[in-house]
């Protein structure tokens, strides 16, 4: 409505071109954790207040991280498909998570919870974050070192101009051929073309992806 004072949005784009049709707009409630889909510059310029739902999905996302990690690492979905087609699991049972080096990129609420769970699995946990925190048992290291040495790399960073495309061909090339990449953060922080190439060429062992550059829908012909 063009005369609305308050607008509630979820994870759909809410650009200036739409907001400017709402001259009475005073408050945008983002029913979502991230708010990069809202034109914050326009809101600041016009005195429009914006709030998000930080923390509502922390537990759920952290759970999903380990669902994907175990699925990819232990080949659960792959083996399910093979067995249903009459094959066997011989030679395809993946490694255990315990004892692996678990690298977390981003130490916000979700990243911090993921680190605690990884420790409970018996992993050696390392983290890269611009803002370091005092988390017992976690070593903070540079991103390149994390990528080179981790068995699991889990992304937990917001989408910003600096993080868009952060995990591209150059960064993926640093990862071990036995490593897996988990992205439950934002789709655009990973270069999908570069990731697909690395997977198809066997340069990394696997990936668990919950987010893409375009949502929704899953675009036809997408490399992943």
Positions of PLM-derived features:
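Short glycine-rich, flexible loops that bind phosphorylated cofactors or substrates
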Residues: 13-17, 36-37, 160-163, 189-190, ...
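Short, Asp-centered acidic motifs that coordinate Mg2+ and/or phosphate
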Residues: 5-6, 27, 152, 180, ...
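Short glycine-/small-residue-rich Rossmann-like dinucleotide-binding loops
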Residues: 12, 33, 129, 151, ...
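An N-terminal-biased, well-structured beta-alpha scaffold segment characteristic
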Residues: 1-51, 148, 168
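Rossmann-like dinucleotide-binding domain for NAD(H)/NADP(H)
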Residues: 50, 178-180, 184-224
